Amino acid sequence: MKTSVMFMLVIVISLMCSGEAQEVARTYCGRHLADTLADLCFGVEKRGGAQYAPYFWTRQYLGSRGKRGVVDECCFRPCTLDVLLSYCG
């Protein structure tokens, strides 16, 4: 009896932990998007102008993300916090 209860407890705890590890994709629009980005990016160092590549190089190597923005990725479709973090800095 004790062994089966312990086994069930271990299963329940592992399921709860695995559910927390999975990041849920959500939509972020308007003020909610701006506030979430501000909270996530707080303290992230901004890039200076000298760190930017020339325009022609940037457009060539950015790929499809260069044509989309944070609104396209997170308002029109659900996105994760990792995607939002990629827009910091």
UniProtKB/Swiss-Prot annotation:
Residues 48-66 form a propeptide. InterPro entries: Bombyxin (IPR017097), Bombyxin_B (IPR027285), Insulin-like (IPR016179), Insulin-like_sf (IPR036438), Insulin_CS (IPR022353), Insulin_family (IPR022352). PROSITE patterns: INSULIN (PS00262). Residues 1-19 form the signal peptide. It comes from the Eukaryota. It is found in: Secreted. GO terms for biological process: positive regulation of activated T cell proliferation; positive regulation of insulin receptor signaling pathway; positive regulation of MAPK cascade; positive regulation of transcription by RNA polymerase II; positive regulation of vascular endothelial cell proliferation; regulation of muscle cell differentiation. Keywords: Cleavage on pair of basic residues, Disulfide bond, Hormone, Secreted, Signal. The keyword Nucleotide-binding does not apply. GO terms for molecular function: growth factor activity; hormone activity; insulin-like growth factor receptor binding; protein serine/threonine kinase activator activity. PANTHER family: INSULIN-LIKE GROWTH FACTOR II. Silk worm has two kinds of PTTH: 4K-PTTH and 22K-PTTH; there are many forms of 4K-PTTH. Heterodimer of a B chain and an A chain linked by two disulfide bonds. This is Bombyxin B-1. It comes from Bombyx mori (Silk moth).
